[in-house]
Amino acid sequence: RRASGAGRIRVNNAALGPAPGRELMTLPYRFGLPIHGWAHLRTGQRRPGRPISFSSTRTLKVEVRGVDEYCEDHGIDRVAFMKVDVEGFEARVLEGAARTIDSHRPSLLLEIEDRHLDKYGMTSADLADPLRERGYLMYAWHRGRWARVNSVTTARRNYLFAAQGGL
């Protein structure tokens, strides 16, 4: 358990976002079962998500925390890596992690898809460009390794952002 780091894992019943509060979350259902991987916060949503193949949705009121606030509250003094896959809400999660990103310079593995970002009025460039301006390099998994890329394409969904000299 110690070698795997499992003792440091904490499960929290909260969503991540730009600031603490309570927000509405949409939870899609398919064949009567919840599709948790497609759940998304409605904060700032400009249009409903595409009902790809779900038959209904449920609206939940959930606690939202910012990464910066969470780290301060739990005495976390080092963040090396963040995986953010939140159905288009990635920029808002990063907004709530601004101090953590600037001080710790963690590697960031982000799902970036215009079809999800669009519901919040954003594009892939709106998400990737500010990270590059902060000195992050962008990579995509290609032929068994992380390869440097300059833009987001529809051929890939996940992109690794690493501070210069960090990969």
Question: What residue spans do the PLM features occupy?
Answer:
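Phosphate/nucleotide-binding beta-alpha loop and adjacent structural elements of enzyme active sites
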Residues: 1-167
